[in-house]
Amino acid sequence: MNSMRRLQTLVAVLLTTTLMGLPAGAQPFGDTDVPFVITPDNVTLEMLKLAKVGPKDYVIDLGSGDGRIVIEGARRFGARGLGVEIMPDLVRLSNANARAAGVADRATFREQDLFKTDLSAATVITMYLLPEVNLQLRPALLALKPGTRLVSHDWDMGDWQPDQTVTVAAPDKPIGREKSSRLHLWVVPAQIAGLWCGAAGLRSFSIELTQSFQSFQGTLRRHVGGQAQARDLAGRITGPVLQANNGSAALLTIKLDGDALRIIGAQSSLSALRGLSLRRAADGRCS
């Protein structure tokens, strides 16, 4: 890829600030944009815990190295998973490690370009990549099913701020001056920008929303007798759920349910809206 030289330069800078040459556990560059640097075992465990991985989850690890994240997810948490790795020797090692751990039926590994991987089945995606790669992946990650959890080791995703960040001691970390790791969690937000229209009895309602990642703003309008009463909304999106707040209190709780927004919670003067469903206006206006 055209970004190969820039990525190699970045990693070289990181490594030379800590050790002369590659440390133990870090593999030299091959036909890949991202080097293999081992994630310490305790960091692997904390990544899975941060994503709240469980038996119903399907974990995809991008740049899976020796397979430890997918294997640990299967062994300790009962999840199924796929490791995507471009280096064939690491894929062979990962499959051998899965067999040795007794989880080969739930942990599989594939030699594949991570940018060409179908991520749609994942409920959790883990990655230890590089900043530029994270940013290149970001559009595909934002397009995933709302509620998909993403955990990145050390690197963020630019102006898409994480929902949670934790710092974990990592005395066995092979690179970096600080023997700690920062783990970032994102929950993929529903894509809700636009005009939504609904009706309850003889009254019609609309919600017009704008969105910046997991934050939203908008206006709720109640249309009565040709007049519109408006109320501003602002809040946060967690997966398919929007929480519009009034100070510290929840004013409206709205859920994206298929192709409709459904008000599942309403407080104060808006309590009559509970149960209202609204659909996105196809032509940019409510009929």
Locate each region found by the language model.
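Glycine-rich SAM-binding Motif I of class I
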Residues: 67-71
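Active-site capping/gating segments
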Residues: 156-199
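Conserved SAM-binding motif I beta-strand of class I
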Residues: 80-85
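Conserved class I S-adenosyl-L-methionine
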Residues: 55-65
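Central antiparallel beta-sheet cores of small beta-barrel/beta-sandwich binding domains
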Residues: 190-260, 264-272
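S-adenosyl-L-methionine
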Residues: 22-57, 87-121
